[in-house]
Amino acid sequence: MNSVFTIIFVLCALQVAASFRQSFGPSMSEESASMQLLRELQHNMMESAHRPMPRARRVPAPGETRACGRKLISLVMAVCGDLCNPQEGKDIATECCGNQCSDDYIRSACCP
């Protein structure tokens, strides 16, 4: 008799657990819709990642190049003929790396 009640209790518990999951868990349609959305987002990201950039964005136009690090040192050496001697508290590294700076600016900021 005890085993019959145990079996009935287990079956009722399984039924309650299954109905609880259906009531509060995500439905299959919601789950598949979110998976579909995730796949679409991944597809769009992969498409844009493999799209080649136009040449105008890859290669800067003349006069738009910035000088940073060794490139700046080479530019100062070419303009001044010597290393930079900062004048007037100008920070040419920040200016020339952040924006395009002209030879005249380098002469006024560095050349003796």
UniProtKB/Swiss-Prot annotation:
Residues 1-19 form the signal peptide. Disruption phenotype: Severe reduction in Ca(2+) signal in AWC neuron and in chemotaxis in response to high salt concentrations. GO terms for molecular function: hormone activity; insulin receptor binding. Expressed by ASI and ASJ sensory neurons. Gene3D superfamilies: Insulin-like. InterPro entries: Insulin-like_regulatory, Insulin-like_sf, Insulin_CS, Nem_insulin-like_b-type. Keywords: Cleavage on pair of basic residues, Disulfide bond, Hormone, Secreted, Signal. GO terms for biological process: cellular response to salt; chemosensory behavior; dauer larval development; insulin receptor signaling pathway; negative regulation of dauer entry; olfactory learning; regulation of synaptic assembly at neuromuscular junction. Probable insulin-like peptide which negatively regulates synapse development at the neuromuscular junctions. Probably acts as a daf-2/InsR agonist ligand to prevent dauer formation under optimal environmental conditions. Acts on AWC sensory neurons to regulate high salt chemotaxis responses. The keyword Ribonucleoprotein does not apply. GO terms for cellular component: extracellular space. Residues 20-58 form a propeptide. This is Probable insulin-like peptide beta-type 5. It comes from the Eukaryota. PANTHER family: INSULIN RELATED-RELATED, INSULIN RELATED-RELATED-RELATED.
